[in-house]
Amino acid sequence: MAKLALINREEKRRKLVAQYAKKRAALEAIITNVSLSDEERYEARLKMQALPRNSSPSRLRNRCQLTGRPRGVFRKFGLCRHKIRELAFNGEVPGVVKASW
């Protein structure tokens, strides 16, 4: 199980990303709009740089919802491979069956 501090840090980042999503999207639209003047685009770039670092979605890490494990996480389930196997064998993950061919 991951340290609780790491799990809490990731949750804090998710909240910041959600909080600044609209502002970040608006600034990104200004920055990529080539019809605007260079000064306007530069000002938007400065405002983007002034946003909190953790408000960027690229800093998020997918973690297992049960254990907090950062690696081997399946997006479809939000669980790490260990927990998927464990829960699937117990029949607790709907739609997952052992492969047979």
Swiss-Prot record:
<dbReference type="GO" id="GO:0005737">
    <property type="term" value="C:cytoplasm"/>
</dbReference>
<dbReference type="InterPro" id="IPR023036">
    <property type="entry name" value="Ribosomal_uS14_bac/plastid"/>
</dbReference>
<dbReference type="GO" id="GO:0015935">
    <property type="term" value="C:small ribosomal subunit"/>
</dbReference>
<dbReference type="GO" id="GO:0019843">
    <property type="term" value="F:rRNA binding"/>
</dbReference>
<dbReference type="InterPro" id="IPR018271">
    <property type="entry name" value="Ribosomal_uS14_CS"/>
</dbReference>
<dbReference type="GO" id="GO:0006412">
    <property type="term" value="P:translation"/>
</dbReference>
<keyword id="KW-0694">RNA-binding</keyword>
<comment type="similarity">
    <text>Belongs to the universal ribosomal protein uS14 family.</text>
</comment>
<protein>
    <recommendedName>
        <fullName>Small ribosomal subunit protein uS14</fullName>
    </recommendedName>
</protein>
<keyword id="KW-0687">Ribonucleoprotein</keyword>
<dbReference type="GO" id="GO:0003735">
    <property type="term" value="F:structural constituent of ribosome"/>
</dbReference>
<dbReference type="InterPro" id="IPR001209">
    <property type="entry name" value="Ribosomal_uS14"/>
</dbReference>
<keyword id="KW-0689">Ribosomal protein</keyword>
<comment type="subunit">
    <text>Part of the 30S ribosomal subunit. Contacts proteins S3 and S10.</text>
</comment>
<dbReference type="Pfam" id="PF00253">
    <property type="entry name" value="Ribosomal_S14"/>
</dbReference>
<comment type="function">
    <text>Binds 16S rRNA, required for the assembly of 30S particles and may also be responsible for determining the conformation of the 16S rRNA at the A site.</text>
</comment>
<keyword id="KW-0699">rRNA-binding</keyword>
